[in-house]
Amino acid sequence: MMTLDGTNTWVLREPGARRCVVVDPGPPDASHLAAIEAVVGTDGEVGAVLLTHHHFDHSESAKEFAQRWGCGVRALDPEYRLGSEGLGDGDVVETGGLEIRVIGTPGHTSDSLSFLVPADGAVLTGDTVLGRGTTVVAHPDGELGAYLDSLDRLHQLATTHEIAAIWPGHGPVIADALSVLDYYVSHRQQRLEQVRAALEVLSSQELRERIAAEDLPRQIVEVVYSDVDPVLWGAAELSVRAQLAYLIR
């Protein structure tokens, strides 16, 4: 799994507060977990662990980390929770005076969530929006229609100035949320048009027959993503499969 510079784990708390929320503890890497604990501090408390989605580079250490700090893990998917509290669109998490609003942003995965921190005008996007480059729509769990809707929702929040910055799951902080979301929306539409163009020579029946062929998505990747490092073609193929499913729905 590609993680750019590694997984960003976010430790959120109000200034002067002891109690914090930890978002996406990440993989069970000793140095990574030690860095999180150093930020929490020896006199700090963890009120909850929140997960943006289930991919292991965000979630694998969550339960063990939470048990060590005596708190729960809240996630959309029950399989990744620790304790009885779930997490879903519209929920508000409050810890130590900090308010976090949950936004459902499916698409990268079916369980993807983003977390709005009103006090900072920032949104934690997990893998829905990255700090560098664009993300993969992880078909079949991820779905392009849902992803486009999620981008539109985030874009609306940026347009109304509810969010100014994006704190992503990988890569650097984005100071200008609106510009990046503009790019993400236009990029997805451009790629979709490129896939559509690659298929326009096929009739509907021929398309449906060839969609089942395992070589078609890779053939499209080689045309549409010819400007992308072949190392990334595996991830690109997942997005192409999502685009094909979107086009023939």
Model-assigned labels for residue ranges:
Residues 11, 90-118, 122:
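Core dinuclear metal-dependent hydrolase active-site scaffold
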Residues 29-74:
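Active-site metal-binding motif and surrounding structural segment of the metallo-beta-lactamase
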Residues 12, 24, 53, 87, ...:
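Divalent metal-coordination and catalytic microenvironments
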Residues 199-249:
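C-terminal regulatory/interaction regions
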